[in-house]
Amino acid sequence: DDFKDLGFIDKQKAHVKEAVSKLTARSDSSLAGFVLDMFCTSMIDVAKELGVPYYIFFTSGAAFLGFLFYVQLIHDEQDADLTQFKDSDAELSVPSLANSLPARVLPASMLVKDRFYAFIRIIRGLREAKGIMVNTFMELESHALNSLKDDQSKIPPIYPVGPILKLSNQENDVGPEGSEIIEWLDDQPPSSVVFLCFGSMGGFDMDQAKEIACALEQSRHRFLWSLRRPPPKGKIETSTDYENLQEILPVGFSERTAGMGKVVGWAPQVAILEHPAIGGFVSHCGWNSILESIWFSVPIATWPLYAEQQFNAFTMVTELGLAVEIKMDYKKESEIILSADDIERGIKCVMEHHSEIRKRVKEMSDKSRKALMDDESSSFWLDRLIEDVINNLS
């Protein structure tokens, strides 16, 4: 169950209240409030008991936040239920999106009754917050952010304060396996390598791995491929490394591609995206990975797996024109095998050196860095947040 850990969080309320009470008792400072992840909204009760406001740090994009508010609103006002759209070809008109949203990219967990209602409870908690910090920036998601600001339903103040990324000290974080990867990249020409990496819970079994291998070999592009074992079906666990990658890959693949590619297990994603040899990124479209790829000006080919990643892929490809599609509505539980031809097509497209998408990603990369500078958009919203937190104390 995707939501089994929420019960565990709920059980920590008494402990959190005790810890915070002790902390404030020994300090001359007053408690300004709580900052909560959306899945920790059970801690709202603790904030209320302590008589302080709470704020949400939303780690996905503004378009998805707007989608959540829309879903909860039509449920509460019209008794609409997203589960009716399972396996549907319908399209939804969502205020935070400029284009109609295909039902096929809805998060799978929201198409199951009990999980859908758990989401509704969470979103109601978001509406009661004093403010919501979103890990995005105005120049990236202006339509979504403006729609949230103009929404007539009860939505708290929104603060686009991103991109918030962990970028520093990468040379100290990569470890021995990472160092070997970076040394290999040092020998590759600029923007010549396509990087395939699918997040902490992304992995593939032998059948899909063979199609990816075939696509890479056919594409004739240099590649760095982080290939990991998928979590057990139905389990929310991180991927693990294969003991022997050669048992998963086609016979002779490593020998035939020895001069053009490297297959590894775990890989230090940020340090790799930062490397000048990387020219494209086949990604699961986790929001952090999207922000990292934009920051380092690396275009994405979308291959979402779980959570809201299909929605993110739609946002990047259709809404923003910042990515190419391999498969926008792929879901890891579907057991569909993507063909080598489809994967190869996406790789060739994302690696085009003078494409419009590459140009747009470079422009957005510059904007993402500028947004964090003094007096620019995200800096402005961070200042506004601090002012509002101080004002809410009185």
Swiss-Prot record:
Annotated PROSITE patterns: UDPGT (PS00375)
Top EC class of this enzyme: transferase
Domain of life: Eukaryota
Catalytic function, reaction form: an anthocyanidin + UDP-alpha-D-glucose + H(+) = an anthocyanidin 3-O-beta-D-glucoside + UDP
CDD domains in alphabetical order: GT1_Gtf-like (cd03784)
Any GO molecular function: anthocyanidin 3-O-glucosyltransferase activity
Role description: In the presence of other necessary color factors, this glycosylation reaction allows the accumulation of anthocyanin pigments. May be involved in glycosylation of unstable cyanohydrins to produce stable cyanoglucosides.
Protein name: Anthocyanidin 3-O-glucosyltransferase 6
